[in-house]
Amino acid sequence: MRLRSLLHTFSGNAAALALAAAAAAGVLAPVPAAAAPACAAAGAPAAPPVQVAQLPDWVESIAVDRRGRMFATAYFTGRVYRIDAPGSAPVTLTGNIGANGGVVVRPDGRLLVGTGNDLAHSLTGDLFPVSKLLEVDPESGEVSTYASGLGGIDGVALAPDGTVYTTTLGGRGIGRVTPDGRVDPHWAAVPQPNGIAVSPDGSEVYVVQTTVAPGLYRIPVGDPAHPRRWISAGASDVLALPDGLTLDGRGRPLIATHASGQIWRAEGGSLCAVESGLRLSTQVTYGQGERGFSAGRLYRAGVDGRIHEVPAGAEGIPEAAGAAGTAENKAG
């Protein structure tokens, strides 16, 4: 695709600003094998990624509820979709509600989705925090405002105590919404913050820095004024464009990357690649429950609208069940 066409297509997307710059630099060409090293395999080599769903839009974020249903935000149409099981056709849950940011599922099953992840709101979000966090009913698609007064929302994370954290990619702001509704758009600051997650015990917030000096930060919840740079990407990954973030069952961060096509995992003080070859990835998440997008399975979403299961990232799945699940997904 010509650069002019790429810029025109992606001009409205804050995350795509980095993509366009990467294209101009030529980094969307194949990345050398000297990118993040492969993670050590625990056993036999895993099966390759399998496509399990397709959406008609740039998928910005995905999350799975306890019933094994996946929910996705679609950047260009601003819609929220529900996919009931691998191989199922997506159900359009909402119209264009501006749902172009992250999505999380609350314990009661309702969704929280971010808005304002366009270029204008992202670049001005630190100065003019006017974006909303919306609450969406997973059955009816009914929409209400959960919180407002946040910077343009890219990433969304939910803490065990119900606190919500957000990122604004075009600035530095990390927002916080407490369970009693208090909003602080400047709770903490990290350069070019993108993917976000909360440690299992709720004591730290993990944030991905996407550009300039990609890496991973830890923000102590008790001391948000002092974020700590935890891991820096290697020199060969300076243009990898890390994006969405999730945690595995051991609390280790996994990160989707745009340009390198790798899914990284944080191990100790370094990053390794769980999987490669999935270019323009935006988010990764684990399934839940015993059916559908089930527990222990890792899923990836991307700019291409495709959802893949990534067996290399699976955990806690008996070998027979894993093989059966993959066969079912291929059939779908």
Regions found by a protein language model. Name each.
Residues 75, 116-118, 169, 209-211, ...:
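Short loop/turn segments immediately following the C-termini of beta-strands
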Residues 252-305, 309-325, 329-332:
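C-terminal closing repeat unit and adjoining cap/tail of repeat-based domains
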Residues 1-36:
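Secretory targeting and sorting signals
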Residues 83-88, 136-141, 177-182, 220-225, ...:
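Short loop/turn segments that connect beta-strands within beta-propeller blades
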Residues 46-53, 88-94, 141-147, 181-188, ...:
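A short beta-strand motif characteristic of beta-propeller blades
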